[in-house]
């Protein structure tokens, strides 16, 4: 395809309607037709990236292969498309302004007054088109964060308006809105959608396709009414009804020919409808599964639905791969202790100790780990979860009562987890951790090696602290083996206790490398061990 096509996904009425899922689903449909597709997210906040944002504020922080801390929607894009993203796939207002200000300081604007239009909008447009020009994608789908009408989003909306004018048929806008159902009146209300589209039109954009989020199926009369009042073709009004799983959304859109409508509007040949066989097989396995596997997730942000999004989805994918339904139980680590851990965790087939930062809730993780170790419950520790495995083992097996991480207690006698050498002179918090994909060599015969089926793997990281190798011999002599390490630095990446059924801690984040068609092998192995433990 000669020219890259650009599709913008905007949202109206309320936030959290699922623009990211719609963008990912549309991308999946186009990819299934043989097109090379990528998806990017523009976030209107002024932070450079979400790396320093509290999970309560923003949910999970996702990490790309090239080490960018990104919005959790990039996780959806990767899980749906099975294609890695980079820092170019997530742009914030902060990065746009930072780039423009740096150019102004260097004199790139030759003394011009730097303004939102054209300088900020030009920088936004440059970032929109970068992926298409650099990587030769057929389609670049751009999700605009926030809701139409938000003051923060205005420069992005203006940039979309300009691009629609400049790119002509190679550009279109998909607008997602909400159609509420008023139970007392027993009717749907389309007025919020009409006003949302009107707002978009006032900003110079006529949407080409409308996606209506709704809890119940809408009648043809309602969709025709929306088409009439919003200046949209009747076949370009698509419903996105609530479904049991987000992975059904591509099929919901496909049944309404959303991909066909978009291809026709862009002057492209439609061709036969793709089967999407692997996707359908995944959903069929999910539907057919009758037995369940109970996994307990121990973390300190469990009350927020999106805080461990990639872990949740990785567990689901691994459970389906093993022909099981996932029964996920969330345990707040601040509410766990040695006195209640056995009672609260006794029904779990497996335990996952979540990543995180800081002292709060860490004693509850130690209690869960001690229970799992003493009762031989399959257990996976990720990042801080792995570090907690090391600390608990040092305290309760090696007799180092004061063992700790220098993150929690800088003056601890036994620094079994310590700040990485290259982190000791770092002063800025943002974007300064060990980030992105790194190599790891696994010890043959280890649980991790058996899971991956190979010696050399690559997984993504997000941490400042590491296992202190000064204690390695003591741990190995006492039964906790270091079975994975970075080939260049010797940094310990994997620890496990071979005497137990399945007890593995990893410094990396395997959840960032798990998709619908390729679930992460470590999660698959962990869930299999939990099933065998029933």
Regions found by a protein language model. Name each.
Residues 230, 262-270, 397-401, 526-534:
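Short, hydrophobic alpha-helical segments
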Residues 435, 439, 443-534:
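C-terminal and late-domain segments of enzyme folds
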């Amino acid at each position: 395809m000669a020219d890259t096509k650009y599709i913008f996904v905007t949202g109206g009425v309320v936030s959290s309607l699922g623009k990211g899922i719609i963008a990912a689903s549309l991308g999946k449909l186009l990819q299934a037709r043989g097109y090379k597709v990528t998806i990017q997210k523009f976030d209107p906040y002024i932070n450079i990236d979400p790396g320093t944002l509290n999970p309560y504020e923003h949910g999970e922080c996702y990490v790309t292969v090239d080490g960018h801390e990104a919005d959790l929607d990039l996780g959806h894009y990767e899980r749906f498309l099975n294609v890695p993203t980079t820092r170019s796939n997530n742009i914030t207002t902060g990065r746009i302004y930072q780039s423009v200000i740096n150019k102004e300081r260097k004199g790139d604007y030759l003394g011009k007054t730097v303004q939102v239009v054209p300088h900020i909008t030009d920088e936004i447009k440059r970032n929109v088109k970068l992926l298409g020009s650099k990587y030769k994608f057929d389609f670049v789908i751009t999700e605009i964060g926030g809701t139409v009408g938000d003051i923060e989003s205005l420069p992005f909306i203006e940039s979309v308006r300009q691009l629609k004018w400049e790119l002509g048929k190679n550009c279109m806008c998909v607008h997602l809105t909400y159609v509420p159902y008023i139970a007392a009146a027993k009717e749907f209300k389309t007025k919020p959608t009409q006003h949302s589209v009107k707002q978009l039109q006032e900003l110079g954009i006529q949407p080409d396709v409308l996606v209506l989020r709704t809890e119940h199926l809408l009648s043809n009369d309602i969709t025709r009414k929306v088409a009439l009042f919003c200046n949209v073709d009747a076949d370009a009004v698509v419903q996105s009804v609530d479904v049991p799983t987000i992975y059904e959304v591509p099929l919901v859109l496909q049944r309404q020919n959303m991909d066909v409508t978009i291809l026709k509007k862009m002057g492209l040949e439609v061709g036969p409808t793709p089967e999407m066989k692997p996707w359908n097989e995944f959903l069929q396995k999910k539907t057919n599964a009758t037995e369940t596997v109970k996994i307990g997730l121990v973390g300190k942000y469990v009350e927020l639905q999106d805080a461990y999004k990639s872990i949740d989805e990785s567990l689901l994918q691994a459970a389906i791969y093993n022909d099981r339904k996932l029964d996920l139980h969330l345990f707040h680590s601040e509410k766990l202790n040695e006195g209640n851990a056995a009672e609260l965790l006794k029904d779990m087939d497996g335990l996952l100790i979540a990543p995180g930062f800081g002292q709060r809730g860490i004693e509850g993780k130690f209690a869960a780990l001690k229970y799992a170790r003493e009762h031989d419950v399959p257990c996976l520790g990720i990042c801080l979860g792995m570090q907690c495995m090391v600390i608990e083992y040092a305290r309760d097996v090696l007799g180092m009562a004061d063992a700790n991480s220098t993150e929690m207690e800088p003056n601890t006698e036994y620094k079994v987890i310590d700040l990485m050498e290259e982190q000791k002179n770092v002063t800025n918090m943002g974007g300064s951790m060990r980030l992105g994909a790194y190599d790891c060599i696994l010890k043959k015969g280890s649980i991790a090696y058996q899971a991956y089926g190979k010696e050399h793997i690559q997984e993504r990281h997000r941490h400042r602290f590491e296992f202190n190798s000064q204690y390695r011999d003591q741990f190995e002599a006492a039964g906790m083996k270091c079975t994975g390490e970075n080939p260049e630095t010797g940094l310990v990446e994997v620890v496990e206790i071979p005497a137990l059924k399945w007890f593995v801690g990893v410094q990396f984040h395997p959840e960032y490398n798990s998709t619908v068609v390729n679930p992460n092998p470590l999660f698959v192995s962990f869930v299999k061990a939990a099933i065998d433990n029933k």
